């Protein structure tokens, strides 16, 4: 079966839709949260069960060198994200050790403002690690390889929920949402190249135990800190809105 579309397809469920916030407000919130000062956290720093997840999509029907796939993925990384999840800036703009701000859709129509840190990048792959406050502690490796003339794009991650609160969220549907997030991302990546393909997913629990010594990570919980920062900003934003409306009435 030829999986190629008749013409290049633009993903319809990508990171393109507006998150509902102006970029300036997003970066202001990131500064208030001190996102750029948060240290990276590996799987050993988290609280919850340890999971290895591998998502793959076979790009059948197109001659795509792995280097081209990764170069495209780096340039348009956030554009392949589903829903209103946002990644601010291409991977190509980051140097190893630098953080990119991200907004992640959460239950109850809320948004988690956090980030990811670039660890390394090569022509055929790149690795990100989560900072303190992120819902997960661990790393994610994005790669492309070729076997028997078929190029495969992959996301492999080794992760734990960072604290007890986020672990509860992952158990109550968070893992399902995250798996679908990366599957849809790979569908969108394939569609960018005009290929309709269904990803494969393999999930393995590497360690079923909780790391109770890291329960204190809840102090850095990004959802709690996001809520406090947004609550503190309400009076100023209400004042700004009032001034704008007064200015509109007098103009």
What are the roles of these predicted feature ranges?
Residues 102, 125-129, 153-155:
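Short hydrophobic/aromatic-rich beta-strand segments that constitute the beta-sheet cores
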Residues 1-107, 219-222, 226-251:
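Hydrophobic ligand-binding cavity/cleft-lining segments
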Residues 107-148:
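Hydrophobic-ligand binding "helix-grip"
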Residues 161-207:
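A conserved amphipathic terminal alpha-helix motif
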């Amino acid at each position: 079966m030829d999986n190629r579309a008749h013409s290049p397809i633009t993903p319809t469920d990508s990171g393109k839709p507006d998150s509902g916030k102006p970029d300036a407000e997003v970066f202001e919130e990131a500064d208030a949260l001190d996102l750029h000062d948060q240290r990276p956290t590996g799987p050993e720093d988290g609280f919850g069960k340890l999971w290895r997840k591998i998502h793959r999509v076979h790009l059948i029907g197109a001659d795509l060198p792995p280097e081209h796939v990764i170069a495209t993925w780096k340039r348009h990384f956030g554009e392949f994200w589903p829903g209103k999840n946002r990644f601010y800036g291409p991977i190509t703009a980051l140097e190893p050790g630098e953080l990119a701000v991200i907004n992640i859709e959460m239950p109850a129509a809320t948004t988690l403002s956090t980030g990811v840190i670039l660890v390394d990048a090569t022509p055929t792959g790149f690795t990100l690690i989560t900072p303190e406050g992120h819902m997960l502690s661990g790393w994610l490796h994005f790669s492309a390889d070729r076997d028997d003339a078929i190029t495969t794009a992959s996301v492999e991650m080794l992760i734990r929920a960072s604290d007890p609160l986020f672990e509860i969220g992952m158990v109550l549907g968070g893992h399902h949402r995250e798996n679908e997030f990366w599957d849809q991302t790979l569908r969108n990546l394939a569609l960018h190249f005009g290929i309709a393909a269904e990803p494969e997913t393999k999930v393995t629990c590497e360690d079923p135990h909780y790391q109770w010594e890291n329960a204190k990570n809840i102090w850095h919980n990004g959802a709690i800190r996001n809520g406090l920062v947004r609550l503190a900003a309400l009076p100023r934003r209400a004042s700004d809105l009032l001034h704008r409306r007064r200015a509109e009435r007098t103009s």
